[in-house]
Amino acid sequence: DGTIDMIATDHAPHTVEEKSRGLKDSAMGVVGLETAFAALNTHLVRKGVITLERLVELMSINPRRVFRIEGGIEVGNRADIVLLDVEHQWRVDSTKFLSMGKISMFDGREMVGDVAMTIHRGNVVYDNNTKQY
């Protein structure tokens, strides 16, 4: 119904030490980059709240439109695309995150779906098979 126009993350990759100073003195924010799609796919798409197409629209298409980022999948354009494995089942283990942030509210939880690969300007910048970026 247009209530939610887009979904984004506040990827704030603080160290364990920075997050262990107590509520008042700890760095604010959470690591969201490595779990955002999986959490939303698991809890919204797989439960029938929204479609996968709607999730892609909320996380990718609409932010591009709102922020006037040129692009799209067209012949002759360099690819800016994220490939998803929507069936991949995995357990969150924040100690294995590539990010500096090693604390996650989803630690130990089962997820379905993951980013398989990210291509930016035609170059692979992340590959989940090799965990290289």
Model-derived regions, located:
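His/Asp/Glu-enriched, well-ordered alpha-helical/loop segment
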Residues: 5-7, 12-87
